[in-house]
Amino acid sequence: MTNRVSKRIVVALISLWLVGCTTAGGGRPTTYIAPDPKAADINVQLGLSYMQRGNYEIALEKLEKALQQNPNLPSAHNAIALLFQRLGESDKAEKHFKESVLRDPRYSEAQNNYGVFLCEQKHYEAAVQRFLEATKNPLYESKAQALENAGTCANRIPDQTLAEHYFLQALQ
């Protein structure tokens, strides 16, 4: 008799458990809401603002959120690379600089920033190439800065002739 009662209790418990599993979502269908395409841009701007104020923890949160919202956004990769560069996390910085220029080779600001990073890492020739890539964009407003950076980096090779060439180009 007890065996029969315990079987009924077990069956009842399993039934209740299964019913609970099927109604856990409240019976409502789950809808996917696509993120606002501008949200990633806004989070990049917020991240840069927090970074300028030295609040790196919140900056990282905002930039990671931007990358979750749009993993293909070059400005998000560039911004988080700058943050990792400041934090001394060179491997992560390089990864995101590469992603940024890969996703938009004409993104001159990222090319220039990547060049600065490479020059700091003593990869002078590669850095100079990034600076020159930055100057190829006719709409880039900081060509003189990129050429000055190329001259500074060429000076560290050391190639005084090449450095002088870039410095003179920067002045024109």
Predicted regions and their residues:
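TPR alpha-solenoid repeat register
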Residues: 76, 110, 117, 144-146
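Structural marker of alpha-solenoid helical repeat scaffolds
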Residues: 35, 69, 103, 137-139, ...
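Bacterial Sec signal peptide processing site at the extreme N-terminus
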Residues: 18-38
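Register position in tetratricopeptide repeats
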Residues: 52, 86-87, 120-121, 156-157
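Canonical positions in the second alpha-helix
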Residues: 65-66, 99-100, 133-137, 169-170
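Canonical tetratricopeptide repeat
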Residues: 45, 79, 113, 147-149
